[in-house]
Amino acid sequence: MADTQSPPPQLGPVQFLMSNKLETAMWLSRLFTVYCSVMFILPVLGPYAAANFYQRALLANALTSALRLHQRLPRFQLSRAFLAQALQEDSCHYLLYSLILVNSYPITMSIFPVFLFSLLHATTYTKKVLDSLGPGSLMFIRNLLEKLTANQQNILKFIACNEIFLMPATVFMLFSGQGSLLLPFIYYRFLTLRYTSRRNPYCRTLFTELRILLEHFVMKPACPAFFRRMCLNSIAFISRLAPTGV
C-alpha cells in the first residue's frame, strides 16, 4: 500500500504573520489607518488631536499604498513606461490621494475613502489570521467581517461618491480660504485616474448614474427652464472634462 502523505501542520498566528511579512506590514498599517480615521471622525480627544489623527491616517495609508505598489511593480525603473504603468494601479492613485490631502484642511469627506478601503482590505487578511487561530475562533469578529464583505459593493459605491463630491469640495475650500490654489487642479488629476481605473469601475459607473438621474429630473415639466438649462450646460461641461478612450 502506498504511503499516504499527511497534510502539512497548520501555522500558528505568529508563524503565519512572520511568514508573510509584507502582507502583515500592510495589514498592520491598514488597521492603524482605521484606528486613526475613527479617532478623527469621532473626536473624543478634542479638535487638535483629531487633526493629528487625520494626518496620521493619510500617512499610514500612503505607506500601505507604497507597499502595495511595490508588491504590484517590484522592479522600479526610472522611465516613462514604468510611470505610465504605475499610474494605472489603484495603489498609486491612493498614494497620490494621501499626499495631496495630508496637509490640507481636514474634512470628514476626504477621510472616508481611506478609512473604508483600509477596512475592506484588512478584512481579507484578518480572516486568514483568524483561520490560523482555529476554524471556530472569535465567531463574533468573523460574523462582522462577513457582513462587511456582503456589503462590499455598496461600500465601494459610497467611496466613489466621496471621490466625486470631494472635487467641488476642494473648490469650495479654495474660496473659503481653507485650501490652496493648486488643490482643485491636482485633485482633478486624481479623479481622472479613478475614472479610468481598470480594477475599480465604480467612479466611472457612478458618474454615469448621476448624469442619467439628473437628466431625468430636469426633463420633468415641473422643472424651471433656467434650472434645466443650467444643469444641462453643467453636464455638458463635466462630460468634456472626462477622459476619452475609456
Language-model features: locations:
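Multipass alpha-helical transmembrane domains of eukaryotic endomembrane proteins
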Residues: 3, 8-246
